[in-house]
Design a protein with these regions (language model features):
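Conserved AdoMet/S-adenosylmethionine-binding subsite of the radical SAM
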Residues: 67-279, 283
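C-terminal accessory extensions appended to soluble enzyme cores
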Residues: 242-451
Length: 451
């Protein structure tokens, strides 16, 4: 399926790209997939975009508009919404969840530098997720962050797959070496910043062979926390992405990677294959124990073992940070936090915590703003008028109450929470579901009732 045309449509406060494809005339329009359009979200799944006359040119964010909005002087509708909803409240700014702030484009163009400088001047709480040693060890950037070290408004997650240089060069082609990335941790830890070893992704069959040295070197470099998530495989991938599966399989030690993931992944989660808890348990156990024994925070972005997160932030951000309390300003209105609380309550008191939709997702204006929900890409049969009125609260409520949805809490967390009733709003009530591993770990003396 080839892309036929891409049209940019400016409709304040959002920008929309309409994508038409050949053969069945699918469209990605106004934030939704229509007429059975299929997965044009990811670069790896877009072979038709490569060397194509229809390919969009890579452009940077408008740094001035973003800086103006962060500082309370937005120049457009989108900026005003973001300021009133997030920036004014100094909501944690996560930079690097989708695009690395330390990529080589930044080294060449320096657009991000101006934004980083503004974030420092505003004392704005910011979390960087990066592999970009060429940027974050560059004298220009090091000097910038040294300037703001006393106010401690920045935190740094450094992403690693393996500590073995040869293996890393095969899996993370063109990425700075593990040694250089450890040096990022050391440099910014020495400045006094909150630093996190980000095991992303933890690849079973690869990461465990160097995990001991990686943990020890990261600890020696000064980490405050570790966050982890396991490699997952998208069964809906394009032919180009599937070629990568063939290439990756022998590095992991399997013949057929899709078949391996299909066999060992819970079907309740649909086509995005995540290995089951039993496969992941020994790996999580090692990292969790390491954190507990060394006074580190533990975060889990994986749906399995998310309950073990010690602060309620899957990124392992602090929940108590006297150096700059602004770094604590991440939302508690998400299931990672509530699973953590349920685990803590169970292992401290023996009580089974219950979770209600109205308590997990409380009154926050961003849940009820239809403009913001336009950022959420979904497949829907809604007409355009209903889609324009759709909010995150409605989306979340549908997932919450639809036991057939892959995003339903019971399915997404693979039984870690189970429905136990219906409340006065006709929303399902879920309860924490203790699992056998918790008893085993507790008997071994592993602390589960702490933070």
């Amino acid at each position: 399926m080839k892309i036929k045309s891409i049209k940019k449509i400016t409709a304040e406060p959002t920008t929309v790209y309409n994508i038409e494809t050949e053969k069945n005339n699918n469209y990605f329009a106004n934030g939704i997939l229509v007429h059975n359009c299929f997965s044009y979200f990811f670069k790896a799944n877009n072979p038709s975009m490569k060397n194509s006359e229809t390919a969009m040119e890579l452009t940077s964010v408008d740094a001035k508009k973003l800086i103006d909005a962060l500082g309370g002087n937005p120049t457009n509708g989108r900026g005003r919404i973001m300021y009133e909803t997030f920036y004014k409240r100094k909501f944690l700014f996560h930079w690097g969840g989708l695009a690395d702030p330390g990529c080589n484009f930044e080294l060449k163009n320096g657009v991000g530098y101006e934004i980083m400088k503004a974030l420092g001047e505003l004392n704005y709480p910011t979390l960087f997720s990066t592999k970009g040693a060429n940027v974050f060890l560059h004298k220009k950037y090091v000097s910038l962050f040294e300037k703001y070290a006393e106010q401690n408004n920045f935190a740094f997650q450094v992403s690693m797959v393996t500590n073995d240089q040869e293996t890393a060069s095969k899996i993370e082609v063109g990425v700075p070496s593990p040694k250089k990335r450890i040096e990022i941790i050391r440099r910014y830890s020495e400045m006094g910043y909150w630093t996190i070893l980000r095991l992303r992704p933890y690849i079973v069959g690869v990461t465990e062979y160097s995990i001991d040295s990686l943990l020890e070197e990261a600890l020696d470099a000064g980490i405050n926390a570790i966050s982890m998530e396991f490699y997952a495989l998208d069964s809906r991938a394009s032919g180009e992405a599937k070629k990568r599966y063939v290439w990756l399989a022998p590095l992991i030690g399997v013949k057929d990677l899709p078949a391996y993931f299909h066999k060992l992944s819970p079907s309740e989660r649909g086509g995005y294959r995540r290995l089951n808890r039993l496969v992941k348990e020994p790996h999580v156990k090692k990292v969790y124990k390491f954190c507990i024994e060394n006074g580190l925070e533990f975060g889990c972005s994986d749906p399995d073992f998310k309950e073990l997160t010690t602060t309620g932030s899957c990124c392992a951000m602090p929940d108590h940070y006297p150096k700059n309390p602004l770094l604590e300003n991440w939302t508690r209105q998400q299931m990672t936090y509530h699973l953590k609380e349920a685990r803590r309550i169970y292992h401290s008191t023996g009580q089974i915590a219950k979770m209600r939709f109205c308590e997990v997702y409380k009154d926050e204006n961003y849940f009820d703003d239809p403009v913001l929900s336009g950022d959420h890409i979904i497949e829907t049969t809604l007409c355009a008028a209903d889609r324009q009125r759709l909010t995150y609260r409605k989306i979340l409520r549908n997932y919450w109450n639809n036991l057939r949805s892959y995003a339903n809490p019971r399915n997404y967390f693979h039984g870690k929470v189970i429905p136990c009733g219906v409340d006065e709003n006709q929303d399902l009530i879920y309860q924490y579901n203790p699992m056998p591993y918790e008893k085993r770990w507790a008997e071994e003396g592993i602390i589960l009732g702490g933070k």
